């Protein structure tokens, strides 16, 4: 099986937990992280030995070395951040909750279908 090259959007507590989980999976490689500023992206990347460090979510979403992105931001930002990544052609894992209401979830799934990427 090919390795999935992951990016993590956000650098908070849930991002740390996800990075730890990825570290034990044989078919996953943590390639990039994105934050709203370079300092937090660098600190997260140092902790998890990540090469690509992005000072914006937009930059992470367009990283050609990333196949899938885990959205680790507050619930209220899940829709915007997930759609940003989906529009860039990335598979997205966004959870707990996917969105803050059904309308947002439907919009997210609509973009995923339109772009033919996994959500």
Which residues does each predicted region cover?
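Structural signature of beta-strand start/N-cap positions in the alpha/beta core
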Residues: 5, 29-30, 49, 65-68, ...
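Beta-loop-alpha module in the N-terminal Rossmann-like domain of NAD(P)-dependent dehydrogenases
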Residues: 51-111
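Basic phosphate/pyrophosphate-binding loop/patch that engages nucleotide-derived ligands
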Residues: 110-118
């Amino acid at each position: 099986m090919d390795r999935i090259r992951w990016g993590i959007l956000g650098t908070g507590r849930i991002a740390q937990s996800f990075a730890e989980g990825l570290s034990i999976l044989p078919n996953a490689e943590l390639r990039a992280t994105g934050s709203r500023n370079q300092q937090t992206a660098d600190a997260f990347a140092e902790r998890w030995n990540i090469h690509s460090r992005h000072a914006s979510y937009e930059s992470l979403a367009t990283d050609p070395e990333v196949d899938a992105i885990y959205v680790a931001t507050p619930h209220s930002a899940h829709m915007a951040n997930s759609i940003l990544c989906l529009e860039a052609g990335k598979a997205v894992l966004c959870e707990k909750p996917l969105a803050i209401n059904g309308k947002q979830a439907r919009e997210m799934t609509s973009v995923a279908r339109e772009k033919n990427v996994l959500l």
